[in-house]
Amino acid sequence: MKSQAFVVSPKTYEPALNVLGVSVTVLASNIQTQGYEITLQSGGEGAGPPPHRHVWDESFFVLRGKVEFSIDGKAGLCGPVTLVHLPAGTVHSYRFGAGGGELFEITGQGGNATRMFDRVSREVPPGPPDVPALTSLLQQNGVTLMLG
């Protein structure tokens, strides 16, 4: 099926999802684009996903604040208008710096992030997660947590 043109404005955004303390607004799912996905992600200081990897490429563009990205165990602080590209299989995480921040995210072909974000938002309550349950949920969506 061929994708159709569409426009998404702030007035038509779907409600934000709470994904482990990060607010995720889905702008385009792979169903809409027939391939890639686009989200806005924001959070307060210290918020961000634990180290993980997945089977799709992912790129982030820092819109606001400072964000510490860890890529294959090496950390770097990124400010506004910085692009971070992560090929499939790259172990990565990020944490928003002082004052919080906001990211624009695009996944590559085969991305399953928006479905995973929706499930985490619905099935994982706020607070410290049940790690075995979270690990299983993520694995069902092509994401592997890198614990320890």
Where are these regions (language model features)?
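Hydrophobic ligand-binding cavity/cleft-lining segments
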Residues: M1-P15
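Short acidic-glycine-tyrosine-enriched beta hairpin
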Residues: V7-P10, I31, F61, G73-V91
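A short glycine-rich, His/Asp/Glu-containing loop-to-beta-strand
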Residues: E14-P51
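Ligand-binding loop in jelly-roll beta-barrel domains
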Residues: Q32, E68, L77-P80, A88-T114
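Short, conserved beta-strand element in jelly-roll/cupin
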Residues: L40-G44, R53-S70, I106
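Double-stranded beta-helix
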Residues: G99-G148
